[in-house]
Curated annotation (Swiss-Prot):
Membrane topology: Multi-pass membrane protein
Organism: Citrus sinensis
GO MF entries: NADH dehydrogenase (ubiquinone) activity; quinone binding
Domain of life of the organism encoding this protein: Eukaryota
Functional summary from the UniProt entry: NDH shuttles electrons from NAD(P)H:plastoquinone, via FMN and iron-sulfur (Fe-S) centers, to quinones in the photosynthetic chain and possibly in a chloroplast respiratory chain. The immediate electron acceptor for the enzyme in this species is believed to be plastoquinone. Couples the redox reaction to proton translocation, and thus conserves the redox energy in a proton gradient.
Bilayer-spanning residue ranges: 10-30, 32-52, 61-81, 94-114, 154-174
A cellular component term, taken from the record's GO annotations: chloroplast thylakoid membrane
Protein name as it appears in the record: NAD(P)H-quinone oxidoreductase subunit 6, chloroplastic
The keyword Transmembrane belongs to this UniProt entry's keyword annotation: yes
Catalytic activity as recorded in UniProt: a plastoquinone + NADH + (n+1) H(+)(in) = a plastoquinol + NAD(+) + n H(+)(out); a plastoquinone + NADPH + (n+1) H(+)(in) = a plastoquinol + NADP(+) + n H(+)(out)
EC number: 7.1.1.-
Localization annotation: Plastid, Chloroplast thylakoid membrane
Subunit and partners: NDH is composed of at least 16 different subunits, 5 of which are encoded in the nucleus.
Record keyword Protease present: no
């Protein structure tokens, strides 16, 4: 998106703070409905980040798939749960071994990510601007590049994901029949 520098920076900071607050809401809210809506906020902020980086196709896919389908499915699943079932579990706020192990794993992943970011040489990356665009294939749009990569470089993972989705669909139909 071609915005002036200060406006772009303000929107970037606003979306980043929305992303951080939404992520904290997902983890810290004891009510699963509030957590699901916070997850929706996180996914919308990610989609808006894609719009800011001129990846409109990925932003539309993010909105349609994750916000429009997955998050709505999570909200429906939480709404179908009995309210007394999950409210009893959250009244006792003691840490268990699983909570400690999970926080240890997440902290180690976070520090390894920070170490990787700091150790990476970012000078080899070609930064593009509006005046000096460096694009490999000028005539191919973003969605065509995604299609080319999915059918060549990422063919096997793409097919594995389709098989996993097919198995999940068959499993959902089998559970619904019972």
């Amino acid at each position: 998106m071609d915005l002036p520098g200060p406006i772009h920076d303000f929107i970037l900071v606003f979306l980043g703070s929305g992303l951080i607050l939404g992520g904290l809401g997902v983890v810290l809210f004891t009510n699963p409905i509030y957590s699901a809506f916070s997850l929706g906020l996180v996914l919308v902020c990610i989609s808006l980040f894609y719009i800011l980086s001129n990846s409109h196709f990925v932003a539309a896919a993010q909105l349609l798939i994750y916000v429009g389908a997955v998050n709505v499915l999570i909200i429906f699943a939480v709404m179908f749960m009995n309210g007394s079932d999950y409210s009893k579990d959250f009244q006792l706020n003691l840490w268990t071994i699983g909570d400690g192990l999970t926080s240890l794993v997440c902290t180690s992943i976070f520090f390894s990510l920070i170490t990787t970011i700091l150790d990476t040489s970012w000078y080899g990356i070609i930064w593009t601007t509006r005046a000096n665009q460096i694009i490999e294939q000028d005539l191919i749009s973003n969605s065509q590049q995604i299609g080319i990569h999915l059918s060549t470089d990422f063919f096997l993972p793409f097919e594995l994901v389709s098989i996993i989705l097919l198995v999940a669909l068959i499993g959902a139909i089998a559970v619904a029949r019972q």
